[in-house]
């Protein structure tokens, strides 16, 4: 059975999107839960992946029907990640890219579908429509011919193939196709309207008129039929057909008084006939129907000017200017609108405002002349229609006829919203369960990724934010952990474990103020975890709140007794107060209790570095790295000390290793670049100092060294510029440190 082009039929998507309330997604989800309960994690994961493949595929269909094309693309691309790429999925993706006007990208999935199934009518059709929009009508026709051969009764394909023939100026084969469609579907007015539009938009105006006449002969009251006929009279023969056009527009309005275009164009016909009052009436009616359209305001302004109603002209012309979408709209209508507005203001005695509008009109006219030149060049030289239409939408005509679609009605829209919620919920649940399975296996990074994907579909899923934050924390993704944990606390402020995880994350991120807030709440409820006291005390010391830190240390002593962590903490406290001998004494006490304790040698190295004992600092950092090779800060400080001792080659090597491990370590780039410049390796030094400046643009010392490096490289202007930036940043720093 044949069917009409997509722009003419109601939305049928729901027939296959909502197969039943308990569709296959529920079955696979239940099967996954059964596998998980049986201890078969791999089987459960496979079932959840099926849920994601089907769920994303159906969600993509819903988004496409809602005209949310980018969301549709995202959903359908996600479906490709979790299961086999079915023909249906690939064609749906091609359609989504096509509807989003990404015609080049639409070719990839349709071509892939065709490679897997050469007899895929849908793949041939989407390739044909995409080539059509890209302006390659030969390829478009070839693909559409292949599609029509496979499904000879598909009238959507036939109609588009007819358009491709018309674009190739091949009238007879297009007429033959449209004749077959008439024989198949019956002699209906809507078919003649569609054919007439195709002929009109491809320049076959006489044929278009004949089709519109056939439409009105079958049904004189068919919506827009007389309007299309009247408009095509004007397009073909101009002012000589004004009476005929007027006659057709009046007939249209008798049957469809609320038809915008009939009111609008009848108003224009009366303008051209200098019949001002009826022109004003019809244009006012058009404005009531489409109050956000700038065009009837523009022409109404002309009628008011002609009748010397300048106050009214000023009002509607200002409205036309305000609503105008672009310079190129309606042959630079906005430039003329400013000109007419200027004239009306002058007539109304508003000379200054009038002159201003006339100047704007002159400027826009100049731009329009340049744009005309560019438009001609684009029209002649553009690689495809998409490029031309993107730069100059006013060049677009028949292309829109194969890309247009109608919005769903209210009832369908409500069902689509329900479908969106349903599939999003199923997808979120599947991602959440996959995250839990990955966490159970110890793959916390992948677990965090799955929880993040679940949140995209349903951020309100119970327990999701905590699971995501915990997985990110265990994967050492501390920055990523903070957002879901903050949301968890916002919803459940009583969750002490979330507070502890969030506080520890902020500590690692060096946000000591937030750490102190959170962990103070934690120790008020959980008083037995010495590690939390330790972290809180360090944060308070870093904040400069020594009195409160001492209180926490006393509580820590009461709970934990004489522990190595206590001595490390006391060592840090003494170091912050400048009592370096006492700090080293406490750190040695920690080593005596546990010589392999992480961080104790690192903190000892910092104290030795502070007092200028670089040999001792080097030994401490090296010892720390033997115990804890992943301590990037220890490695950085080792490199710093080596460079300070003029052990340049060794220091450069260590700093290079630091950057390999942590590519966003600004100070490592800074020290490495500075050392390279001093060594005479100017090019490498400039590169690393540029990286430092990119990562830490507000550091005066970085800008200073980069400026000096540019000068050394002979780049005087850049060098002086960065030295000036450094000076400004130093001044800003001084202002901020003033009491």
Whereabouts are the PLM-identified features?
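TPR-adjacent "capping" and linker segments in tetratricopeptide-repeat scaffold/adaptor proteins
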Residues: 18-27, 48-52, 326-331, 375-381, ...
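Alpha-helical segment of the N-proximal tetratricopeptide repeat
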Residues: 24-50, 54-65, 163, 390-408, ...
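Structural signature of tandem alpha-helical TPR/SEL1-like repeats
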Residues: 37-43, 66-78, 100-112, 133-146, ...
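Structural marker of alpha-solenoid helical repeat scaffolds
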Residues: 54, 82, 116, 150, ...
